[in-house]
Amino acid sequence: MTLRSALDDYKRTRNDARVFPGERRSTTGTFSGLDERLVYVDRDGWHRDYSYPLSGLGGVNRSRFGVESLDGTLWVEDFETLSQDYVGDTALVKTVHDAGDFTVTQHDLTLGAVHLTRLELVGEFTTEPTLHAFFDLTPEQQESRLGKLEHEDTIEIHHDRQHNLVTASTGLDDVFGQLPEQFGELVSATDTVSYPRSQSGGSKYEDALLNGTVVLEIPFDVEDTGTETVATTTVASLLFDTDDTARQAGLDAVAEAAVAHDTVAALREAATDQVDVTVPDDTPRRDLAVEDLRVLSLLAADTGAHIAGPDPDPFYVYTGGYGYTWFRDDSEIARYLLEADERLGIGLDDWLDRSAAFYMDTQLDDGSWPHRVWA
């Protein structure tokens, strides 16, 4: 969450007795990302990055998906959400929405630094549907002084070193820049801003270009079965640092990821391959073991450390921060895993080795550990 979006949320929720104004809430959906990126997928269809503590990369701050119709844009958040579940033992998230005349089946999967959202619409349409995708992208956690580049079928938002890319398996029909919250809107006690805006720019040419807000018009791959219409597309976003990845390599990678995962079967296969520990079928209360290991994988860094949780308070207004490894908590987790593995034989040797190496690397000269560290 950036300062602009935090102020907007504060004005919307400051009189709500049940929430903390300005926080990044993640209580109604679920998470994907067993590698370097951690992405929250809400039941309303939008997603947001919680990746910075794990990878040092800033990603999606806000997003929305909608379907263009003759009556305007129908936003997924306004549909009835029928279900949201993980697929099997994986971190592939399946969400089903009912839009009345059609249903939307959404699959979300985070692989490495790529997040994939596949949308499948099935039903009756008065006109060929188009996807509207709004993104507020924040490379290096920045919300201003950003560059926006349009490639043939990819939008690029960049700051200094970090670049965020978005594309779709079906390409992009159009790209519209968005005017960020203006000073008068920010300081107003009541005015809130909803995206996407109707206008695409400000009084100056650069107003809609030097920030990370953008709307994409994305065509669907449409098939008429005779009894119903099926429309599909896969939207992919990639975060990368030019110190590690060249721009062209990033452009190639995000395009290949979108096309390679444009079917449910491909997503399921990739999600299954991503799980590095398979819980034996005869494990007592296996479903609980799978859920616990999935949560720990979501919170794990490459170092073997675990952050306390997806950080809801990036400005440290209400807490001391969840995007850290707290040694007391992490060591207890490692001990419980060791005891559970000794009893159940799940096969967590690699996990435990990474934890031990992390403790050795961070131990101080006097034999103690700091209170907390970045993962």
Predicted stretch roles:
Residues 1-283, 338-346:
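Terminal accessory carbohydrate-recognition/targeting modules of carbohydrate-active enzymes
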Residues 115-117, 288, 329, 355:
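Alpha-helical packing segments of well-folded alpha/beta enzyme cores
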Residues 231-253, 309-326, 371-375:
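The feature captures the catalytic groove of carbohydrate-active enzymes
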Residues 277-318:
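Conserved oxyanion/phosphate-binding beta-strand-loop segments in alpha/beta enzyme cores
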Residues 291, 295-299, 336-337, 358, ...:
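Generic, well-ordered alpha-helical scaffold segments in large soluble proteins
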Residues 300-314, 342-375:
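Helix-terminus loop motifs that line ligand-binding clefts
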Residues 323-341, 345, 349-353:
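Well-ordered alpha-helical segments within folded domains of soluble proteins
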